[in-house]
Design a protein with these regions (language model features):
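N-terminal acidic leader/helix
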Residues: 1-34
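Hydrophobic side chains within alpha-helical segments
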Residues: 17, 55-57
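Short, charged, amphipathic alpha-helical segments
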Residues: 22, 38-49
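Short, charged, intrinsically disordered terminal tails
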Residues: 59-73
Length: 73
């Protein structure tokens, strides 16, 4: 992927809903099974890792917010 494609992907990750992220992850996982080019496979695996990372970050932030709310209540 070129620089512009990566920038577009990062914008998607930052702005996409959890459902959109999951849909993209599922689609990428399906493509990964069909692709044989090592460079493309590497890009897809990186994209999958980045999506997983974003989902975990969002879950962590959500958990922290809930803890703060319960402490202030």
């Amino acid at each position: 992927m070129d620089k512009q494609e990566w920038k577009s992907f990062f914008r998607f990750i930052e702005g996409g809903s959890e459902a959109e992220l999951q849909q993209r992850k599922d689609a990428l996982a399906g493509v990964l099974q069909k692709v044989t080019d090592p460079g493309v496979r590497s890009d897809i695996r990186r994209m999958l890792r980045l999506i997983d990372e974003e989902v975990l970050i969002r879950q962590n932030l959500s958990s922290r917010r809930q803890v703060r709310r319960s402490k202030s209540a």
